[in-house]
Amino acid sequence: MDRRRFIKGSMAMAAVCGTSGIASLFSQAAFAADSDIADGQTQRFDLSILQSMAHDLAQTAWRGAPRPLPDTLATMTPQAYNSIQYDAEKSLWHNVENRQLDAQFFHMGMGFRRRVRMFSVDPATHLAREIHFRPELFKYNDAGVDTKQLEGQSDLGFAGFRVFKAPELARRDVVSFLGASYFRAVDDTYQYGLSARGLAIDTYTDSKEEFPDFTAFWFDTVKPGATTFTVYALLDSASITGAYKFTIHCEKNQVIMDVENHLYARKDIKQLGIAPMTSMFSCGTNERRMCDTIHPQIHDSDRLSMWRGNGEWICRPLNNPQKLQFNAYTDNNPKGFGLLQLDRDFSHYQDIMGWYNKRPSLWVEPRNKWGKGTIGLMEIPTTGETLDNIVCFWQPEKAVKAGDEFAFQYRLYWSAQPPVHCPLARVMATRTGMGGFPEGWAPGEHYPEKWARRFAVDFVGGDLKAAAPKGIEPVITLSSGEAKQIEILYIEPIDGYRIQFDWYPTSDSTDPVDMRMYLRCQGDAISETWLYQYFPPAPDKRQYVDDRVMS
C-alpha cells in the first residue's frame, strides 16, 4: 500500500495514475457553449453521452502514466506554482449577467501532471465546446515560467478548477477540484479542511493503492443569479471508469453536493471505496501522544459519526495510532456517515495558521439503497499535520468483477454541523489520562500504586435531565481488560454527564482494545453508542516513572 502526502493550502495531492482515453473518444470532438473562453468545435453532450463514453473507455486498455510536462513546469517549486494566478477577466462565467458564481482553472505544473480537459456546455441546447489551454488565460507573476515553452501547447490542459461565490468572486473560492479525483468545499468560514474523492481503490489491501483521475469536466453555464451549478466528470484509472454528475449548491452557510455516478469495472477490484473522504488527526483530547507543541489539539476532524441502517447512532473518536489500523463497520443500507469537526472553540486549538476550529465537517447521505457492506476507517500514524492520515469510505459487500456496472447516488454536506444528529444524548468529548485513583484525589506524594488508564466521555442533549432521577446506567463492553471505578458525574458547565472509568489490563497483550459504551435508563437506550480503540503499552511500560528531584 502506498500513501501520499498533501501540499497544504491551495493544493491537493498530485495525480499519480494513468492518462485517459478521452483523446481518442474525442478525436473528432467538438463542443459549444456560452463561455467567451471556449474555443473548440460544437458537439452534443449530456449525461447519457458521458455514460456511453465511460462504458466504451472501460473496454479499452488504460493508457498509463501521464506524459512529461514542459521542463519549465515540471521543475516548479510549490511557492512558484502558487504564484500563478488565473486571469479573473477570463473566468468561465464572466459574461453571465448578475452572476453569483464563477469558475477558474488551475495551471498544470509541479506534481500536477495529469492533463484535465475542460468543456463549457449550453444546458438549453446540450451543445458544448472545449476550452483549450493558452498562456494568456493566466498571470505568471514571479513564478519564473518560460512561457515560450507553452506556446502552441493547446492540448496541455489544466490541473483542475475552483469556484467562487459572490460577494467574494475571484477572491475566496468555495469549491475546489484538484489532483486525481480529490475535491473540497467550505462552509461560511471559507476555511478548507478535509477532502473527498471520486473513488478509492485498494486503500487497505496487499496491492498498491490506486488513485483514479478525473480527466475531463463539462460545466453547464450557470443561470443569472443562480447559486447552484452542475458539472460532469469523466473518471479513469487502471481498474475502472466512471461518469459523474455533480449538482453543487453553494448556500450561505454550507455547500451541498448531489453526486450521481455510473461505474464500469475494467478489472477485478479487491476493495472499492464509495464516497471516500480523507482527513487529518494528529492529536486531540483523547490522544495526546503527538501534542508536544503549543497547540492543545491538531486535527481536521475529531470523529467518525455513523447513522446505521437499523437506526443506531455511533460516535467513533479518531486516533493517531503508533501502528496503522483499519476497522470495518458492517451495515445494511446506511442512513449516513461522515468525518466531523464538532469542536469549534478557538481556545481548544490556539492555531492562527491552520484555523482548525473553522474547518468543516463532511456528511454523506445515501440517496439510493446501498445494500450490505462496511464503513471502512483507516488511521495512519503521523508525527504532524502535513500528512492526511485518516481515510473513510463505504465498501459494498459484493466483490467487483471485470465488466461489472453499478451506480450510486449520494449527497455531501460541507458544513459546521451535519444536517442530522442523534435525537438521544450525544458524545461531546472523549478524554484519557492516568487512572488508578479517586477523581479529585490524585496523590501528590507518589503515583498510584497500580497502573490504569482513565477514560472520561461527556454526553450532552437528549433526555438526560429526565432520565437522571430514574437512574442513568452506563453499559460498557470491552474486548479485553476490565473497567473499574465507574462514575457518573454531572458537569454543570456543559449541562451534561461525564461517564468515567479506569481500564485495567488482565493480560500482557498489546493488541488494540475495542471499547463500546452507551447510556441506558430503565432498560432503554438514551444515548448514541460510543466506540473507541485503545492501544495498551507494553507490559514494561505499564508503570509510572517518578522523575521528581526532591533535594
UniProtKB/Swiss-Prot annotation:
What GO terms fall under cellular component here?
Answer: outer membrane-bounded periplasmic space
Where in the chain are disulfide-linked cysteines found? none
Q: How is it modified after translation?
A: Predicted to be exported by the Tat system. The position of the signal peptide cleavage has not been experimentally proven.
Where is this protein localized, as stated in its record?
Periplasm
InterPro entries on file: Gal_mutarotase_sf_dom, GH-type_carb-bd, Glucan_biosyn_MdoD, Glucan_biosyn_MdoG/MdoD, Glucan_biosyn_MdoG_C, Ig-like_fold, Ig_E-set, TAT_signal
* Biological process according to GO: beta-glucan biosynthetic process
PROSITE patterns membership: TAT
Q: Write out the entry's keywords from A to Z.
A: Periplasm, Signal
The protein's annotated pathway: Glycan metabolism; osmoregulated periplasmic glucan (OPG) biosynthesis
Homology family: Belongs to the OpgD/OpgG family.
Question: What is the name attached to this protein's record?
Answer: Glucans biosynthesis protein D
Q: Which organism is it from?
A: Escherichia coli O127:H6 (strain E2348/69 / EPEC)
User: Lineage, please?
Assistant: Bacteria, Pseudomonadati, Pseudomonadota, Gammaproteobacteria, Enterobacterales
This chain is encoded by the gene named mdoD
